[in-house]
Amino acid sequence: MQGLLLFAHGARDPAWAGPFQAIAAELQIRRPELPIALAYLELMAPDLTTAAGALVAVGCTHVQIVPMFLGASGHVRRDVPPLVESLRAAHPRVLFVLHDAIGEQPSVIRAMAGATLDLITSVTLPADPLNPATPTELPQS
């Protein structure tokens, strides 16, 4: 059975995880048959080992790990591969596939560029920056 493990950095503020939880929830709606876990490198729980163990416990024999990072930072290049190797050693009958950072995917780059343009073209700016009482709409492209 296939499983999906989303792996994010983690933060002290619990609200930081909101977008990642929303992604996991959206994926579960789109693929209700797919066991999905969300794990964090640091500062939040569950960690990668715990989340992978939960997927294995429900019968997953193939687990795809998607680093939810914008780029291949030091964490993705330096910290994640040894963690995945430890999963492989702990669960030798499970195939763990580590993908590239999600932010390096062309579809994510296009989506973020589009969202950025949506943000900057929907803002009303003052016609005269020294007199903010005179707003003007930016042209839509």
Regions found by a protein language model. Name each.
Residues 1-141:
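Active-site-proximal alpha-helix that buttresses catalytic centers in soluble enzyme cores
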